[in-house]
Curated annotation (Swiss-Prot):
The lineage of its organism: Archaea, Thermoproteota, Thermoprotei, Thermoproteales, Thermoproteaceae. GO terms for molecular function: metal ion binding; nuclease activity. It comes from the Archaea. This is CRISPR-associated endonuclease Cas3-HD. It comes from Thermoproteus tenax (strain ATCC 35583 / DSM 2078 / JCM 9277 / NBRC 100435 / Kra 1). The keyword ATP-binding does not apply.
Amino acid sequence: MSCCAYFRGRDCLQTYEDHITQALEACERLRPYYGRWMEKAFGTADAAALAVEFHDLGKLAKAYIAGNRARYRHEVLGAYFALKTLQTEARYYVAAAVALHHEPMILAAYAGELGERAIHVSTLRAMLKDSDLSLGCTPNYSYRPEVAAALREWASRPPTADDVADAFQELAVYLSGGAPEEARVKRLRVAGLLHVLTVCDNWGARGRPGEGTFISRYMTVSELGL
C-alpha cells in the first residue's frame, strides 16, 4: 500500500513515493549548480537530497492521514526527525529548511490564528498536544539510511508534543546563537537550502491541479528548464 503526499478531501491525488521520487530527480538536476556550495556550507553535497527526503515525512503521521491538518502541520515532524536523526551540524540547517518549506501555512496555523506574528514553543506544544503523532504509514521506496533510522525510531517510540517543542527550542537556540555576523551566515545558509528544497518540492508536485504559486512555478521553469 502506498502512502499519500497530497489529499483532496479523503482522495489521495499523489502518492508519497511518487512525490519524493520526483523531487529527488529535480535535486539531482540541480546538484551541478548547488552541490559545491552545499559541500562548503554544510559539509555534504547531499544536504538538499536529505531535506527532500525529510520535508514531507510528517505526512506519514496518523494526525495527517486522519485529516487533522488545522492543528497539525506536517513540516513539524519532518524537521524534528531531521534534527534528531542526522549526526552532523548540517542537521540544524536541514531541519530549519524543512520547517519553513510552507512558511505562510505554518505561520497561519500556529501564529496567525492566535493573532501572533511568530511561532512560540509553548504554542507549538499546545497545538500538538491533542494530535496523534504516531507513524501511520511506512513508505515503499528506496529511502536513505538516515530516513530508515528515523522510521525505525518513530515506529518504536512516537515523539510527544514535548519532544517536538524541545527540539524546536534547540533549533532556535542554535540558529540565533553566536555573534551577529555568525547568525547572519546561518540565516543565509538556511535560505539557500530552503530555496533549493522549494524548487524540488514544486517539481515533485507537478501535475497536481491548481498547485503552486506563480513564483514557485516560475522557479521550477527557470531553474530546471521545464
